Amino acid sequence: MVAALFGCQPYLVQRLLAVDNDFAAILKGNGQYAAVDFAVDIAVAIPVVQAFFNGQPELISQAMKFTVVHCCILFLSDGGSIAAWGQGFKVCTSAAAFRHDSSVTGIMMSLCSERFVSSLGRSYTTSFPVSGKHYDQVYRASILTLTELKKTTNKPHCDSA
């Protein structure tokens, strides 16, 4: 999970766990399953992003470019995330492994920065060095219902390829 979600920068995940003790406890108690429950590749991620930005191609393009450069993460309301790699999007969720409930009810976008916004909307002050800089602005988007994403497969980890 560490390598997949944060591009082989484990200290970022360690900082995340430091601000969310509940999540750390879940990881400790669900070792082999806590990484990622399933992954959906770019074929699914792109329509989700399109719906998220109300079908405005220029926003989608800007968002995709930003994710590659600035490590943007789209957080699903069930605790999963759409994490960006240089080679494209992957949809990763871990909450399904914890609660055995993979229904996706909403999505929120935030940028890795000094203020980290969790999937529950809580704002944490923490330091996320991204591209050698610190960003203190967090972009949020209104909740979007996404009932089409369901748990379809069980994978032990999320590929970064």
Curated annotation (Swiss-Prot):
Superkingdom field? Bacteria
Gene Ontology terms: cellular component: cell outer membrane
Question: By what name is this protein known?
Answer: Protein YzcX
| Organism whose genome encodes this protein | Escherichia coli (strain K12)
